[in-house]
A protein has these predicted regions:
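N-terminal pre-domain/capping segments
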Residues: 1-91
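Active-site acidic/histidine proton-transfer and metal-coordination neighborhood
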Residues: 74-158
């Protein structure tokens, strides 16, 4: 069965994303669980998670799909960015688990000039493995491909 959905806003609260998707006659939808433009995330309260799950049930929409924030770069050459990227991926997997979201979309990032494409791929694989090991639940990570711009990982799988 084909499902149609859109990326919807979480403005106001996470459960409003479900209502917005329903108002658009979506069968499924994608969202951010937090601002995509900053590293820090406000914790999701148990009440917020429950309201989100109840909205999914009430509107019969699913599965919900989460999208990683824009800042993480699991292929990063700089150690501090790489570490923050793994932390954020792990944190986002835990947020998905808390909300009952089965899928998390992530960009693969950009490798540094010194690292090169192959090392960038290896870093992404390692980052994803570590985040899966360190997180709760069984959320599936979906890898978003790119247009194969300079230094991107995910534009080709060669």
């Amino acid at each position: 069965m084909v499902k149609l959905g859109f990326h919807v806003s979480i403005a106001g609260s996470l459960d409003l994303a479900v209502e917005r998707a329903a108002a658009l006659s979506c069968d499924t939808f994608q969202m951010f669980t937090r601002s995509p433009r900053v590293w820090a995330a406000k914790p999701i309260s148990d009440g917020t998670a429950l309201a989100f799950k109840k909205a999914l049930e009430r509107f019969g929409i699913g599965p919900a799909v989460d999208h990683m924030p824009y800042l993480p770069n699991p292929a990063a050459e700089k150690p501090d960015i790489y570490a923050k990227s793994i932390f954020t991926l792990t944190e986002e997997l835990n947020r998905c688990h808390q909300l009952g979201i089965p899928y998390l979309v992530t960009h693969l990032g950009h490798h540094g000039k010194e690292d090169g494409h192959r090392k960038g791929q290896e870093k992404v694989i390692s980052a994803i493995g570590q985040a899966l090991d360190d997180s709760e639940g069984d959320t599936m990570i979906l890898l978003e491909n790119t247009a194969n711009e300079k230094n991107t990982v995910g534009g080709t799988f060669a």
